[in-house]
Amino acid sequence: MIPLPLQMVEAGLRLVDADLSDGTSGNLSVRGPDGTVLLTPSSLDFRLLTELDLVKVDLRSGEAHGRRSPSSEWRLHALAYEKRADVNAVVHHHGPWSTAAAV
């Protein structure tokens, strides 16, 4: 089985490859078993993302652990996890087609 952090890196690359992200627009997170979330960092191109760049955020305290800052939209992810116990991952992107449809 592929380790979760590597799966997140690969998911970011798939967003870029599918033209759903220019590389820096959007973020990914996965719920951890211990009340935390593993999140992509702020302002880092998915093409440059490594497993070491991911940030662990405690959903209760908001405390972040990692060498980078978490996505500025981490609270959006936290709210999704709070409201939906059945949700274990969030993909938030600003792809050109979805953005055009929203306008």
What annotation goes with each model-predicted range?
Residues 96-103:
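Class I SAM-dependent methyltransferase SAM-binding "motif I" and its flanking Rossmann-like core
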Residues 2-91, 98:
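An anion-binding catalytic pocket shared by soluble metabolic enzymes
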